Design a protein with these regions (language model features):
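A short, Trp-centered hydrophobic/proline-enriched beta-strand micro-motif
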Residues: 157-165
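Long, acidic (Asp/Glu-rich), low-complexity accessory segments flanking structured domains
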Residues: 260-278
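A short core secondary-structure module
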Residues: 139, 190-240
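Flexible, small-/acidic-enriched active-site or ligand-binding loops
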Residues: 234-262
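A structural signal for short hydrophobic beta-strand segments in well-ordered beta-sheet cores
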Residues: 181-183
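N-terminal glycine-rich flavin-associated loop
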Residues: 122-145, 171
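Alpha-helical interface subdomain recognition
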Residues: 12-118, 141-146, 153-157, 186-187, ...
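Short, Lys/Arg-enriched N-terminal segments with co-localized hydrophobic residues
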Residues: 1-11
């Protein structure tokens, strides 16, 4: 074939869509015009410089976020919403722009690569381009009656939901949860009685409701028989037992008990006994976006280290001339480049598949992206601390904050071990596309 023919036949294109490139520039302009001035006012820099952990954390109130910190985040979200950015990923029929998986992955990387700032706070997962999986979860699984009942409140921010899936004794093995819900009438009204405990119940300090996953039928280990209930946070029997203090503070993750909590019969989302699928429905979306954020933060650490190594001149010679400095950063940059391509390819493929097809065919790729990105950013932050020396270890640089925050994602969003197990299942044909192939070979 001639060169021209090869060009005509080519189908591989690594260029980002032009409208996405333009949107990144639009976001950058918005940050410069609106977000940075807000961050610079009223000593708001205290939430991002060396004072950040204390400025954000109310140590005398269970380690919860200070009200001033949450108020600042709310102001930034309002500016973003007014400018049309906050709901970018929402479906158009829900007031959004229908942002694709590829676009969201690129945006998350782009913002995280800028470092710490009001435009995209790592710790709270606040961003001027909102993620909010509950919106898409609700759209996908809510019945017409549920949508009519809760849709306007949820979209308008009047309904804020905590998330209760993990339990003190059950994390990765969610199908063994001990929380139960049984049908029980109260004063002649049919309903449910919930008993159990949940752990790391995100957002309970501001929640109006909490999503409680409880077993309604079946036995331990069954994926079916679990229902997602929507419980008013002020229901009798709902009690925040303690807020769990973590490596990176403040916290909004309590242990919550549910003691004979009664709710009306229609207080659930999705279908009875099919709630676990709701809880896991957007796990791929969350994991690919989290991978992109970790990649962006890793790239920031590498870029800052390279810049510093060129500027710092001990003994009259730039650090960057030393192979002991060069080689670890070369390794990290190589991983960033490879991971970026896999994340974008996987996100692009996700845009062309229904959820069930993603699970059947490329769930392992999502796990590859997620576990490796979260490991990579920890390595990059640690290396940045080393390159920057004493200042790198101090809180006057952001690397310790990046490390402390992203270290959690090697446990949450599916632990590193669970992700690797998923990849292994696909690789060895215990799940995924190779399963039938290996089964046929075994039969032969």
């Amino acid at each position: 074939l001639s060169g021209k023919s090869l060009q005509e036949e080519a189908t591989m294109d690594f260029d980002l869509p032009s409208d996405l490139v333009a949107y990144l520039a639009e976001l950058d302009a918005f940050i410069e015009a609106k977000i940075k001035p807000l961050q610079a006012r009223d000593d708001n820099e205290r939430f991002f410089d060396h004072r950040r952990e204390h400025a954000r954390t109310d140590w005398d109130n269970n380690g919860l976020p200070r009200k001033a910190w949450e108020a600042l985040l709310a102001k930034a979200r309002k500016l973003a919403d007014d400018a049309g950015h906050l709901r970018y990923a929402w479906p158009p029929e829900m007031g959004g722009k229908g942002g694709t998986q590829l676009a969201m992955a690129v945006i998350r990387e782009h913002l995280a690569a800028k470092g710490l700032g009001l435009f995209n706070d790592l710790q709270t997962e606040h961003s001027i381009v909102g993620n909010n999986p509950f919106i898409l979860m609700f759209k996908e699984f809510a019945t017409n009656a549920q949508y009519e009942r809760d849709g306007e409140k949820l979209l308008g921010g009047k309904m804020r939901t905590g998330f209760g899936l993990t339990e003190p004794n059950h994390g990765s093995d969610a199908t063994f949860m001990e929380t139960t819900a049984v049908r029980q009438d109260k004063d002649g009204e049919p309903g449910w009685l919930i008993r159990g405990e949940k752990m790391w119940t995100t957002g309970m300090h501001v929640a109006t409701h909490v999503m409680v996953f409880a077993r309604t039928s079946g036995k331990d280990g069954d994926a079916t028989g679990i229902t997602c209930f929507i419980v008013p946070a002020d229901s009798p029997g709902v009690k925040i037992e303690e807020y769990m203090w973590t490596f990176n503070m403040p916290t909004d993750h309590p242990r919550v008990s549910f003691t004979d909590v009664w709710i009306p019969k229609d207080s659930y989302w999705g279908q009875i006994d099919r709630g676990l699928g709701l809880g896991q429905s957007f796990v791929h979306q969350n994991r690919i976006r989290q991978a992109a954020s970790s990649l962006g933060a890793a790239q920031f650490c590498v870029d800052e280290s390279v810049k510093y190594a060129r500027e710092r001149k001990p003994f009259g010679k730039a650090l960057s001339e030393n192979q002991a400095i060069q080689w670890p950063l070369v390794e990290l940059q190589t991983q960033c480049e490879m991971l970026r391509l896999l994340i974008r390819k996987t996100a692009w493929q996700m845009d062309r598949m229904e959820h069930k097809e993603i699970e059947r065919t490329i769930s392992d790729k999502v796990s590859m992206c997620n576990y490796w990105a979260n490991r990579l950013v920890c390595e990059a932050a640690d290396r940045a601390m080393q390159v920057h020396g004493g200042m790198g270890y101090s809180r006057h640089k952001p690397f310790e904050h990046i490390y402390r925050h992203h270290r959690r994602y090697r446990i949450t969003e599916g632990s590193e071990e669970i992700q690797i197990r998923k990849v292994a299942a696909y690789l060895f044909g215990y799940a995924g596309p190779k399963r039938a192939q290996f089964k046929d070979q075994a039969g032969a």
